[in-house]
Amino acid sequence: VREPKLLWNLPGNIVPPVTPFDANGKVDVAALRREVDYVVAAARPAAICVAGVEAQEYQYLDEAGRRDLIAATIDAIGGRVPALVGISHASYRESIALAEYAAKLGASAVQLLIPNRPSGGPATTAELVKYFGMISSASPLPMVAYHNPGPGAEVGLPALREILALDNIVGLKESSRNQRFLGTLIADVEDQGLAHVFTTMEVLFPTLILGCAGGTMPAPGAAISALLVEAVRAGDLARAAQMHALHAEMPARWVGANGLVPVMKASLRALGLDCGEPYPPFGAVSAAHVA
């Protein structure tokens, strides 16, 4: 048993701001700063995820643009909450370079996607452990592994345990929403002190009850998630259940027909934060779904 090294206010939520783009496809830094201010004030996050999940659309940027986005977001955070910086890349060398860059900017930790083989198909457990070992051993910051089947690999609990047993890997962001799997994962990883486990919106309430460290929440749902976490910490499970009922509907009611990023940007606009449209050619929420 080891003690995880994320010195954050847990249980709590990690919030990844969406990336606002202007009409020319450039990052709208002013809009980004307004969104970060909203996240800090309304979501009271344990950390802000910086260019670390696919819904942040960082993958459309070139390497210089990605680094500029990281720097602009950390500057907008201004030390108010910890920054968790994404370093996912097919090249382990580039991931290490991004980790070093994040450390120079004052980040708290880095996040790395569990990948498929860049050439196609699933990687073996041995390959994934080697990939994470090469990066985590060279990273100046502690690392959160990111399990997101689809954009990344789908791996089972034995492989996750091997990855999380590596030195300097202190957390797991888990996106499967499979509650049966999550129950065993929390028991074998969080409860055993191997690493902190962060789930996601639809399963936040039940997994908090099981003892997870929190969740990764999209910006427009993060204020509700903060209320849910605070209710659980206070022992007010009836209040937490009310917040959970809201999560059960949003974004599930709209995301299937429109996609996650369009729903998140439309939701932020409804909150008074215009973060633009998804990066082209992928479209916005259909007019029929905009109230």
Can you say where each PLM-predicted feature lies in the sequence?
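A general structural signal for well-ordered alpha-helical segments in protein cores
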Residues: 32, 70, 95, 182, ...
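Active-site beta->alpha loop and helix N-cap motifs at the rims of alpha/beta catalytic domains
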Residues: 2-154
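Soluble or luminal CAZymes and related metallo-dependent hydrolases
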Residues: 31, 65, 127, 177, ...
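Catalytic alpha/beta core domains of metabolic enzymes, predominantly
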Residues: 134-137, 148-248, 252-258
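C-terminal alpha-helical cap/extension of soluble enzyme domains
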Residues: 2-3, 9, 14-20, 38-45, ...
